[in-house]
Amino acid sequence: EELQFPTTTPKETLKKTADFFAKFKNLKAIGIGSFGPIDVDLKSKTYGYITTTPKPNWSNVDVVGTLKKRLDVPIYFTTDVNSSAYGEVYARNNRGENIETLVYYTIGTGIGAGVIQRGEFIGGTSHPEMGHVYVCKHPIDVANNFDGVCPFHKGCLEGLAAGPSLEARTGVRGEHIDISSDVWDIQASYIAQAAIQATLTFRPEKIVFGGGVMAQNHMVERVHRKFEELLNGYVPTPPVKDFIVTPAVDNNGSATLGNYVLAKSLVQ
């Protein structure tokens, strides 16, 4: 069974979430993939909280504690992109790809990334925040004095390449921008830089880009071209069309699958 609803206030959204799961009398565990940043340190007093998020009214919200009051079951709590990365590895390995190391980016209203290495999430005291790394500005953005839209860093990857940056540059929402616009090559240059950073840092077998901005075929092709230009043959990778790809599970289903498998791991 599936239910979708908008993310509104914490009180309303978490109530709807609890109401949905409370219907299942044999519920054993749940998996949550949340937007972040979140506290995933089990020893922390604020474990299970959304912390300093850019999303209005959601900072310092106790997600796990609130749901546990209604649903007395184990909860696997991680980021939405970690869930997606886990789901991608699971789906791809089930069809015989034998993936051990994978990076999953979502490029939508924000940017985040999750990394799976040998079946485990990458992260020390917390999870990666790879959407907020700094990137080299595109010459057109420099010429136009475009600072970026991230409320914390302005010109980080998210500030320059997430969906809202398209509208900030053009005054038009991304889905209404013609594919001939220069703005797509600007976006591709930043997304390719993210892929370069992931390649050189983790040496993954696969980089997956999900989210609304990447849901257009022309964007993937632009990123492929720019990635090969920037990497310039420095390290070997699989053929770019096999290396930098879109999700294996349709309709953002990677996160749902990942959350299911992670929840199941709590009761096995």
PLM features: what roles do these ranges have?
Residues V103-Y105:
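Conserved beta-strand elements of the Class I
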Residues S44-S59:
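A charged helix-plus-loop insertion that forms the helical arch/lid used to bind
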Residues E1-I30, I38-T46, G65-V73, Y90-T101, ...:
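ATP-binding/phosphotransfer module of carbohydrate and carboxylate kinases, centering on a glycine-rich
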Residues F77-V81, A85:
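Short loop/edge segments at beta-strand edges and connector loops
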Residues I111-I116:
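Short beta-strand scaffold segments in enzyme catalytic cores
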Residues D80, G108, N259:
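Active-site glycine-centered loops adjacent to acidic/histidine catalytic or metal-binding residues
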